């Protein structure tokens, strides 16, 4: 698969589950990084709402393939089942169309 996708995920956590949400997500990210079509991910915490985690992900696959293949991986099952308890509202997933990358030149 030669198509690259990027997307942003917002995970608005419940304050009482902030640490559990983060640790559960980190376990998934460790496994996710081993996937052959994984490119990168950046995990952030919202400044405006510290209970919200935000991911920026890039994959070498189509959005449809990502949603049907990666969201159902066995290492995600416990995490996916826990999300309704950990989140104050449903997560959002916004797909982006990569246009161009800008990187700092090597010194």
Language-model regions: role of each:
Residues 1-5, 42-51, 80-107:
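Glycine-rich beta-strand-turn "strand-cap" elements at beta-sheet edges
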Residues 12-21:
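Short, surface-exposed ligand-recognition loops at beta-strand->loop->(often short) alpha-helix junctions
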Residues 3-5, 20, 37-38:
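Short, flexible segments with low predicted structural confidence
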Residues 5-12, 40-70:
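Short, well-ordered beta-strand segments in beta-rich or mixed alpha/beta enzyme
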